């Protein structure tokens, strides 16, 4: 089974994914906890490319291609092999985040995101939990924890307006 958690930054996706993995492992299930962007060595390299440096160095289209490449590597090297081995895969983010942030917040590129997903990924989660919360609260929590993902806060704020 492939389970994903989606929601804005600071909504508790990582915490809830970890709690679910711990709960299932405590009941004897073999689980794999992962994240996007990233989750495999190649996808982590792409994550660094996107998160570090000048945020305007990539066009929206190039960024979509990078995220799709990272997801493809993640799918090939971790998700599919784990599912094939009978494990439950729990991911902090997957394609819905790309559909929202790159597909809508950086222009009307949803069609491109969907086409690339169909061609290169071709998999949807079996179950997605969407964590809904006040955007201001989530962003405040994300900023308070720090880390290297401030690069997307502006895009995420714009996405909240679109929603």
Language-model features: where?
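Hydrophobic positions on the alpha1 helix immediately C-terminal to the Walker A/P-loop
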Residues: 16
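Walker A (P-loop) phosphate-binding loop of P-loop NTPases
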Residues: 10
């Amino acid at each position: 089974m492939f389970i994903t958690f989606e929601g804005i930054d600071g909504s508790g996706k990582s915490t809830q994914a970890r709690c679910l993995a711990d709960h299932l492992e405590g009941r004897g299930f073999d689980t794999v906890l992962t994240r996007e962007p990233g989750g495999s060595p190649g996808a982590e390299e792409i994550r660094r490319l996107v998160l570090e440096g000048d945020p305007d160095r990539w066009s929206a289209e190039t960024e979509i291609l990078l995220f799709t490449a990272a997801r493809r590597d993640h799918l090939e090297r971790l998700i599919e092999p784990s599912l094939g081995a009978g494990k439950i895969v729990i991911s902090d983010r997957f394609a819905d985040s790309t559909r929202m942030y790159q597909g809508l917040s950086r222009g009307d590129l949803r069609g491109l995101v969907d086409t690339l997903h169909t061609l290169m990924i071709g998999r949807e989660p079996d179950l997605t939990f969407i964590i809904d919360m006040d955007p201001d609260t989530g962003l405040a929590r994300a900023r308070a924890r720090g880390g290297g993902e401030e690069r997307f806060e502006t895009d995420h704020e714009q996405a909240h307006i679109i929603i």
